[in-house]
């Protein structure tokens, strides 16, 4: 007989019981050390911030940094008292609590002031430097406005404002809103025309009562004597006015009988009688 013997069955590895691993205790030391550093840093920052704020409040309440001197640059149209009142500062104010941007914003509301600079000089001085606008003409745009040398309408006229400036007409508030750049360019051209007239000899700014602008045509002058239209168009003002100056003395006795003078030609002048 065959000798039969039972084979040993292999036990799967996943069924082999292994001795449990020994767990290592968590080392809390480095973790607590790191956390304590973080909390300590945060507490330090908070303490410094709070301390700085308390120091700021303390210094701002003391008399050590109080405003004593307010320096204002010399002005022609706006008084020193008006500047200080508009700035909203006064001696005794805390130097630290004076907000320079706020002071600049307040002063910029005055239309006469073109540029404003405010500086703080510790311990006791505030310096206000401003430049004023200078009117070059009066423009009628539905109401009267002063025009500065940059072609900017900066102030509406009120009772008591001077009117002895060249008068510019032909612009409307609607046109200014719809085409601000185009209107400003035309106003600059009007200023160039005024400068040309100021330098005139026989025919000058004193001979003009009004400078009228038409978007489709250009410029037309109206004479002081008789209100005669002098058509200029656009550009070449110096050459055109020089030609008129050559015959203006002859025309002066006839001004009441003239309908218009047309200079908008390259080589001639048209004088039309009524």
From Swiss-Prot:
Residue ranges that the UniProt entry lists as topological domain Cytoplasmic: 1-33
Record topology, Periplasmic segments: 57-274
Gene3D superfamilies linked: Cell division protein FtsQ/DivIB, membrane protein fhac
GO cellular component: a single term: plasma membrane
Transmembrane annotation, as ranges: 34-56
Top-rank taxon, per record: Bacteria
Occurrences of domain POTRA (ranges): 65-133
Functional description taken from the UniProt entry: Essential cell division protein.
The name this protein goes by in its record: Cell division protein FtsQ
Species the sequence originates in: Geobacter sp. (strain M21)
